[in-house]
């Protein structure tokens, strides 16, 4: 295994996780940055309807991207298992299966999303002032879904072999291109929402092209050739057994957030615009838990494959302690500095106030989610994704959506109350996995 690929099965646990998590976090920061740049530049050069359109449209595209990333986690885990088992040919077969599988998914999603853009905007209850712009944003981004999928599949494969540095490089390229594209299309040519969407798709296209060029020159701990680009039924079954439950879990979670978006849209244009700003800030706030989850999944996958269960447990606990320590700091920033953070995206004082209100209610989740995401990462890495799916479905439909609706209908309600629905949901998730861990240990002791 080359120096660029990290072996999680040997060496100090904390250092191994940290070496992997830092570039993962860096990639997530840059990925969130080029998503936030759209809203930031549109907010500076456009109006509230444009902010609402990009906020609502990007929420849906974020959902689609998360689903793809979650399904690709099946590939990450299976490749990690093969690496831990020292079976490079089987790892290559998993890569080939992944390429064909996601190519089929990309073609289907492109056609479906293009034709369904209007219905999606209606379901999201986009405000009348921003309805047409929301449709436009979704359609342009949907045209580039193949590119979005390609990037996430490449990143998933690289994480499976323990390489988090190249995804960081590729997303860095996309971020720079997107910033330049937004400034040109939105700031100079005044293309508003359309310019932001075009810049995002083009940026990822450039990133994918660069990734293909770089990967052709890389040595990785797998045996892979073009002839392996086909469906291997055995590998497909393994990938889907892990990836589908994770994707279903993520789908329900993202649908629940879209429902929350819809609930807030009914509160008016300003709350809708404020929530759009807040969600972009949240996308940054949640990067630490997300990097922890991806790191734990890769760490556990390799160690389970190598038969080192005690080391997998040690990595899990180390990730929780590290993540929560950073989460406390992020909580303070989100709770007390929400207004300052929101002002980077817009000059509208009312939109800033609405965004800051939501962040106050939400910010406790910065700490809680580090525990939840570490648990999800552990079960994903073990290949036990059914509990993850059950937790996601029940938390979305039994907790987050009902609590959000109730909070939005309280007398003299505000986005602070709606924002509290997320940490309340996370507490449920932590309790759920505490029970699952107890059952897992009980069965292992028999």
Model-derived regions: residue spans:
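Short runs within selected transmembrane alpha-helices of multi-pass transporters and secretion channels
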Residues: 141-159, 167-175, 196-211, 290-293, ...
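Short alpha-helical transmembrane segments in multi-pass integral membrane proteins
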Residues: 1-21, 79-146, 188-244, 300-365, ...
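Helix-terminus/linker motif at the lipid-water interface of multi-pass membrane proteins
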Residues: 29, 33-52, 121-128, 184-191, ...
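Small-residue-rich hydrophobic transmembrane alpha-helices
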Residues: 51-111, 148-167, 274-338, 369-391
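N-terminal transmembrane alpha-helices
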Residues: 8-40, 44-45, 59-74, 78, ...
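Transmembrane helical elements of multi-pass membrane transporters/channels
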Residues: 19-38, 140, 174, 203-207, ...
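Alpha-helical transmembrane segments and their lipid-water interface positions
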Residues: 31, 35-42, 65-72, 76, ...
């Amino acid at each position: 295994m080359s120096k660029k690929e990290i072996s999680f099965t040997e060496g100090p646990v904390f250092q191994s996780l940290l070496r992997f998590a830092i570039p993962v976090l860096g990639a997530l920061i840059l990925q969130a940055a080029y998503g936030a740049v759209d809203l930031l530049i549109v907010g500076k050069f456009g109006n509230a309807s444009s902010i609402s359109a990009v906020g609502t449209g990007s929420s849906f595209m974020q959902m689609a991207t998360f689903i793809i990333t979650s399904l690709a986690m099946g590939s990450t885990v299976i490749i990690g298992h093969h690496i831990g088992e020292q079976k490079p040919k089987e790892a290559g077969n998993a890569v080939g299966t992944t390429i064909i599988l996601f190519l089929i998914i990309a073609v289907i999603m492109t056609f479906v999303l293009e034709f369904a853009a209007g219905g999606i905007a209606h379901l999201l209850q986009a405000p009348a002032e921003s309805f047409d712009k929301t449709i436009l944003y979704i359609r342009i981004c949907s045209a580039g879904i193949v590119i979005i999928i390609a990037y996430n599949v490449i990143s998933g494969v690289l994480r499976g072999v323990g390489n988090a540095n190249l995804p960081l490089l590729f997303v860095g390229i996309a971020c720079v291109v997107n910033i330049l594209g937004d400034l040109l299309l939105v700031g100079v040519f005044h293309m508003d929402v359309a310019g932001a969407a075009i810049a995002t798709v083009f940026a990822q296209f450039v990133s994918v092209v660069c990734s293909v060029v770089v990967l052709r020159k890389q040595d990785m701990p797998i045996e892979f050739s073009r002839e392996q680009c086909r469906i291997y039924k055995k590998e497909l079954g393994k990938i889907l057994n892990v990836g589908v439950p994770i994707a279903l879990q993520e789908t329900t979670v993202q649908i629940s957030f879209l429902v929350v978006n819809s609930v807030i849209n009914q509160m008016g244009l300003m709350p809708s615009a404020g929530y759009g700003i807040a969600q972009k800030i949240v996308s940054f706030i949640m990067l630490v838990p997300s990097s922890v989850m991806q790191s734990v999944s890769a760490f556990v996958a390799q160690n389970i494959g190598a038969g080192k269960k005690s080391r997998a447990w040690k990595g899990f606990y180390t990730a929780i302690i590290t993540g929560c320590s950073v989460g406390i700091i992020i909580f303070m920033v989100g709770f007390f500095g929400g207004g300052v953070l929101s002002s980077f995206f817009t000059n509208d004082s009312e939109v800033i106030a609405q965004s800051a209100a939501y962040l106050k209610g939400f910010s406790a989740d910065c700490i809680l989610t580090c525990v939840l995401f570490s648990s999800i990462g552990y079960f994903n890495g073990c290949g036990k994704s059914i509990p993850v799916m059950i937790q996601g479905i029940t938390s979305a439909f039994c907790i987050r959506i009902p609590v959000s609706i109730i909070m939005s209908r309280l007398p003299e309600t505000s986005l602070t109350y709606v924002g509290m629905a997320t940490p309340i949901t996370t507490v449920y998730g932590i309790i759920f996995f505490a029970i699952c861990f107890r059952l897992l240990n009980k069965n292992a002791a028999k």
